[in-house]
Amino acid sequence: MAAIKDENNDHLVQSDNPEHPSNLIPALCRNFYSHGWVTGTGGGASIKRDNHIFIAPSGVQKELIQPHDIFVLQYPTPKYPPSARQYIRKPLELKPSACTPLFLAAFDRGAGCCIHTHSQWAVLVTLLVEREKGPEGCFEISNIEQIKGIPRGKGKGMLGFFDTLKIPIIENTAFEEDLTSSLEEAMEKYPDTYAVLVRRHGIYVWGDDVAKAKTQCESLDYLFQLAVEMHKLGLPWVKS
């Protein structure tokens, strides 16, 4: 049994440290489930530590994930084809996350953690933006205190109360991995963004580390919910 474990590099996901990625990912997923962000096996999370990428599996109840369920990739690794990705630790009978190439796109930009949720508020704002601005519109909001929880850009500090937060929106596809090119195009068009919305689907949020990715995700979800409620009251998202 020990030889099998060594062969599968199980030691990579075994740690008593609560800050180890294999322990953080299950904890994050339980937290996200309580918010309704990863309902019905949706969503995911990934953490980069040194030259390893730790990823939650696909198609499982995220609130039940355990450390031994975590995949580990060698980084850097090719996004495509999936067979070229260098997994150095694979749980038996579980599928790698379909979000993997999108997570890798965030890590290629220097992220330390990337989160994908199916937040209902995120989905709703993508529909409202489409109706009000058309398919090319992005989500914008200003003069809300919680905006201060979002970075202005890499190394540029945080947004201020009077700044306008802009989050690009891309169209959904039948298969998760097919979102990668659109996500990367949005990253190029909005180089200071730390999130990309996916219409009728959810959002990808990344940060320099786990804490920043988590708090940015929370701040954005707060802003999306607020935006939906503001829309009901006929209040503009961007103050004139």
From Swiss-Prot:
Annotated pathway: Amino-acid biosynthesis; L-methionine biosynthesis via salvage pathway; L-methionine from S-methyl-5-thio-alpha-D-ribose 1-phosphate: step 2/6
Cysteine pairs forming cystine bridges in this chain are none
What GO biological process, any one, is recorded here?
A: L-methionine salvage from methylthioadenosine
Keywords attached to this Swiss-Prot or TrEMBL record, sorted alphabetically, are: Amino-acid biosynthesis, Cytoplasm, Lyase, Metal-binding, Methionine biosynthesis, Zinc
Q: Which family does it belong to?
A: Belongs to the aldolase class II family. MtnB subfamily.
Q: Give the protein's function.
A: Catalyzes the dehydration of methylthioribulose-1-phosphate (MTRu-1-P) into 2,3-diketo-5-methylthiopentyl-1-phosphate (DK-MTP-1-P).
For this entry, the protein name equals Methylthioribulose-1-phosphate dehydratase
The organism's lineage is: Eukaryota, Fungi, Dikarya, Ascomycota, Pezizomycotina
